Amino acid sequence: MINLKSLEKIKKCVVPLKSRSLIKVVGPDALKHLQGLTTNNLNRLKDNQSTNTSIYNGFLQGNGRLLFDSIISLDREHHNGNPKPISMAPGSSDNSGLDSFIVDIDSSILEEAMAHLKQYKLRNKIDIIDVTENFNVYSILDKTYKTVRDDSLFAQLEKDQCSVMMDPRHQIMGVRLLVPNNKQLVVEERLSKYESKDETIYNLFRLSQGIPQGVKEYQWGNIIPLEYNFDLLNGVDFHKGCYLGQELTSRTHFTGLIRKRIFPVVMSVKDVESASVMDEAIIDPTKPPKESLLFPKRILNALNLEHPPSDSALIVKNISPKHNQQQSSDEPVKVGTDSEIKTVSRSTDKFITGIHGVGLAMLKVENIDIFQLDNTVVHDKSNKELTVLPPCWISKLTSLQMTPQQVS
C-alpha cells in the first residue's frame, strides 16, 4: 500500500534512482562505436561538448526489435575534469583525441548490455567499463524546470563535479544528476530543500506521463521502438547514418503511421476531474509550465486499486460522434464463455504493466480520440474501467499528419 497523504501535496522532490547502472565507453573510436548501435545521433553530444546535455537512445537487434533503452551523456570527468590515462595501445597513455560517454541503463540488464556493446567492438579502440559503483543517479521532479541554465543550485552542483542535465525524453521529467561517490554527502546537503522520495514515486509519475523504461516495460527483443513512442520521446534521429536494426524503424516511420502506441492509463474513479484536464505546457509547449502538483486527483483517488495483469487484453472503444465505424475486418471477436469474456482482434489492445493502479497500455491509435481523451472508453476482461491519461507527448501526436496508410 502507498501512503496517499505523502503524495497529495507534492510539487517537487528528489529521488535516488537505485535501479540504474552506468557503463563508460571511452577511446578514440567511442563515438563511432556507439553511433553504429543506437537510434539517435550522438554527434550532437560531441558537437555540443556540454555535460548539461544527454540523449535518449535505443539499442536494437539486427531485425530492428528493441533490446534496451538508455540515456547517454558525455563523461564529465573526461570532458571537463582531469581524465585518467587510458591505454589504447601498448606503451600509450595519451588521452588526446579520446571520447568518453556514460550510458545510463536499467540495472537488470547490465550484463546483457555489456555483452552487446562488446560483441560489436571488433577493432574499435575503446574500453567498455562498468562504472556503476563510482556514481549515484538522482532525479529532481519539478514541472517548472525547462532548463538547468542560470540556476545557482545546479551551478554549484557542477562545481561539485556532478553532471546536471534535463531529462532528454521530456522536460516534465525534470533534472537528472550523476553524482560522484566522493561528493554524495555534499550533494545531499545541497538538495535538502527538496523532499526525498522513494523510486516508486518516480516510477508512478513516469508511468502517468506515458514514458516506458527498462526491460520490464520494453520486453527485451520483442517490440518495435516507435510503438513505444521513441519518436515522441526524442529517442530517434531519422536522418543519421546507418546503425544496427535501422531498417525496420526507418521503414515504419517513412511508410506511414503505426497502428499501435503505448498510452498511460489509470483505474477509473468517478467524480474526479476530466481526463482531458492537462497542464497548459503539455497542450501548448510554448507556454511556460506552472508549479503544480505532481499527482492530480484522478491518480491519487485510484492509487492502490488493482490494475489488470500484465499482457492482459483490453476492450477499447472510441465513442466520439465523429469517429468512423470500424471495418468489419477489424471488429473484435469474443472468445470464451459468457461468464469470462475475452476480447481479441487482429491487433489486440492490452495492458502492459503498472503499479498502484497506474500503468501503460498498448492501444490501437484508431481507438483513441487524441483530441478528447474522455471519448475513449477502456475496460479490462472483468469489466473494470480504465481512463486514458494525457501523456506528456500528446502535443507531438496530435501534430502528426493523419494519413490512411498505416503499418502494423
From Swiss-Prot:
Family: Belongs to the GcvT family. CAF17/IBA57 subfamily.
The entry's keywords: Mitochondrion, Transit peptide
GO molecular function: transferase activity
Protein name, per record: Iron-sulfur cluster assembly factor IBA57 homolog, mitochondrial
Range annotated as the organelle transit peptide: 1-74
Entries under InterPro entries matching the protein: TrmE/GcvT_dom1, YgfZ/GcvT, YgfZ/GcvT_CS
GO BP annotations listed: iron-sulfur cluster assembly
Location in or out of the cell: Mitochondrion matrix
Main location: mitochondrion
Keyword Ligase: no
GO cellular component entries: mitochondrial matrix
NCBIfam families found in the cross-reference section: ygfZ_signature
